[in-house]
């Protein structure tokens, strides 16, 4: 491997939507940072059968609906 081309790999704490925490290694953030998830495997519609509502992060879902909402099948 070449030296000094890879990102810093360190431990972070991940907090799931139900409050469960675990420590993992990642290139995200800095050593000791906490990553709070908006959606995780326990709440993601793909894994729960679509029973959960979608989280509109930054208005992306609204923007999509405004742009493509009038297209019918």
UniProtKB/Swiss-Prot annotation:
Lineage: Bacteria, Pseudomonadati, Pseudomonadota, Alphaproteobacteria, Hyphomicrobiales
Ribosomal protein in keyword set: yes
A GO CC annotation given for this chain: ribosome
Entry-linked PANTHER family: 50S RIBOSOMAL PROTEIN L31, CHLOROPLASTIC, LARGE RIBOSOMAL SUBUNIT PROTEIN BL31A
Subunit annotation: Part of the 50S ribosomal subunit.
GO MF annotation terms: rRNA binding; structural constituent of ribosome
Family stated for the protein in its record: Belongs to the bacterial ribosomal protein bL31 family. Type A subfamily.
InterPro entries, per database record: Ribosomal_bL28/bL31-like_sf (IPR034704), Ribosomal_bL31 (IPR002150), Ribosomal_bL31_A (IPR027491), Ribosomal_bL31_sf (IPR042105)
Organism from which the protein derives: Bartonella tribocorum (strain CIP 105476 / IBS 506)
Protein name: Large ribosomal subunit protein bL31
GO-annotated biological processes: translation
A matching Pfam family: Ribosomal_L31
